Amino acid sequence: MTFSIVARSAGPDPETASWGVAVASKFLAVGSAVPAAVAQVGAIATQAHANVAYKGLALAHLDEGATASVALQRLLEEDEGRDHRQVGIVDVEGNAASHTGSACLDWAGSVTGDGYAIQGNILTGEEVVSAMEAAFLASDPEAPLARRLLAALEAGDRAGGDSRGRQSAAVLVVREGAGYGGMDDIEVDLRVDDHTAPVEELQRLLGLNDLYLTASTEEEKVPMTPELREELEAVARAAGHRDLEGWVGAENYEMRVAEDLSWVDRRILAIARGEEGAQ
């Protein structure tokens, strides 16, 4: 009833790596049950007749140094319901493992490779996981992991996805210090709990996440000159705010404008100027 991808970002350095899961299903709020990830540890998707305890157990095994395959073996050995489970795991190094129990409903299966595990059950066919793998491998390895995961999820959805229909989707990505304000490791945590086109809606939300919850790169920062400050102060007042700081706070642009107003993100500048497609 679900298809998912678990992956680690490209590159050998775990200090800058991301781990994540993207999932879709004809199931209410699939993001509350399937994905889990911890930066510098790994990620897991547990599905089919999901044993949600797998999430904490697998991450604990990985944190103790187990590889993905060893962690998976330990989960299955301790679970009498293993034949009804489907699970994918990627460890800190990008080693991947997947299991599809013999009692999972057709079509059910998986594929693994360097840095990813893709699995699904009650699918329209094997072409779903094949399309997901092809899309993930064709995506830019330097792109944000969330974008690569959603490219795979979207490909699986287009290929047929869950044979029962569509209802929910989610994406979870972790990277050390990547959270809001750098205060935690949650790079992306988005869920579409009940929607007629959940994967499409998840793509829309990821665009908003990039704008509001992702820090500006050095290339995106535009120095705040006196002339630019005057222009933006006028925009703020025209929008009914007392000043530029008030506008930034009201519009939730804190991640895209310097606290001391020494720079502004070029996307925010485009929005302020009303440029087409800026949002």
Q: Where are the language model's segments positioned?
A:
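A short amphipathic alpha-helical interaction element
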Residues: 220-257, 271-275
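C-terminal soluble interaction/assembly domains
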Residues: 259-263, 277-278
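Short, solvent-exposed loop/turn and secondary-structure capping segments
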Residues: 33, 256-259
